[in-house]
Amino acid sequence: MRLMVSGGGTGGHIYPALALIKALKKREPNSAVMYVGSERGLESTIVPAKGIPFQATRIQGFKRSLSLENFKTVYLFLKSVHEAKKMIRQFKPDVVVGTGGYVSGAVVYAAARLHVPTLIHEQNSVVGITNRFLSRYVDRIAYVFDAALDQLPVNKMVKTGNPRAQEAAEVVSHFSWTEYGLQDDVPTLLIFGGSQGALKINAATVAAIPEFNHREYQVVFVTGQKRYDGVMAQLKGTTVADNVVIKPYIGNMPEVLPRVAAIVGRAGATSLAEITADGIPSILIPSPYVTADHQTKNANSLATVGAAEIIKEADLTGETLIAKADQLMTNDALRQDMATASKQLGVPDAADRVLDVVEALKRD
């Protein structure tokens, strides 16, 4: 198999692509892979660091208002399509896969024009602008949430789940809470606003710590590296009990997650793939700062089947956080029901499912 993959801009587009590549290398060790990303996106550092061949093209996103900058965007897009065609002719992929982000638009479109089999992967409940554009040109569309079904051509769609879920499901965890000075036999709530941290989640957690101090359950609060010093400054003079641990980040999150009783966090596609793969009950606080409010729609996909509770960011305070946390952490039966619902949404073989579609395209 010769596979070209493109996706970039955010981790939500990059990590599913990396999980797919990992699964391909496991299935076909002699396969050849080329990752095409943007010059300035996160992928330009993350992908080469994984030892994956990487080529870059220059591209930028459209402004949502009428702007002269959009003329530059069109020019760069057409230039990127031209560059991508050269890369495709040189690499000769059997299939080209796009996982979202503007760069995948140019690469997958170029492949379609060259009659190379194409697949896009849509991680969210609300389809992104790039995948909407590509949907009319590609051969197949892999998707995660049923809410995407009425936004794309149904005859091309295959439900696969998010490849990142398979990575999470395959982890064999040897982690112990004793590494954090906590106990393994006490339920632990993880509060995590993402790798950068989330100001509003951090503020609510800081306000809730005096209450968390007196709970029978444990709390691990991950602030985000950049926000750790600010959080600790806010907590100056506040007692933090032994059942509460504050961390700037967790480097081995896939090993930690299977030990978590419940999680408080955002509703990004990658996070939800990992949460459901491990069957973790969640309290989701969708980011209101994302396109088309897609995190709320992602969260609703879990909440409607009883796998998650939702707190709108506008309603998030120390009091509302404590109330929801107590509701889950003091009720073992509720947590078990939510864990079962979460696990049923998980797709532990998602990367293999996407690969099956890729291999079918190659055969066709």
Curated annotation (Swiss-Prot):
**CDD domains linked:** GT28_MurG
Q: Write down the membrane topology.
A: Peripheral membrane protein
Q: Which residues bind UDP-N-acetyl-alpha-D-glucosamine?
A: T10, G11, G12, N124, S195, I250, Q295
Q: Which GO terms describe its cellular component?
A: plasma membrane
The entry lists its GO molecular-function terms as: undecaprenyldiphospho-muramoylpentapeptide beta-N-acetylglucosaminyltransferase activity
Gene Ontology terms: biological process: carbohydrate metabolic process; cell division; cell wall organization; lipid glycosylation; peptidoglycan biosynthetic process; regulation of cell shape
Q: Tell me what reaction this enzyme catalyses.
A: Mur2Ac(oyl-L-Ala-gamma-D-Glu-L-Lys-D-Ala-D-Ala)-di-trans,octa-cis-undecaprenyl diphosphate + UDP-N-acetyl-alpha-D-glucosamine = beta-D-GlcNAc-(1->4)-Mur2Ac(oyl-L-Ala-gamma-D-Glu-L-Lys-D-Ala-D-Ala)-di-trans,octa-cis-undecaprenyl diphosphate + UDP + H(+)
Q: Which residues form a coiled coil?
A: none
Q: What is this protein called?
A: UDP-N-acetylglucosamine--N-acetylmuramyl-(pentapeptide) pyrophosphoryl-undecaprenol N-acetylglucosamine transferase
Instruction: Name the source organism.
Output: Levilactobacillus brevis (strain ATCC 367 / BCRC 12310 / CIP 105137 / JCM 1170 / LMG 11437 / NCIMB 947 / NCTC 947)
Name the lineage.
Answer: Bacteria, Bacillati, Bacillota, Bacilli, Lactobacillales
Q: Which gene encodes it?
A: murG
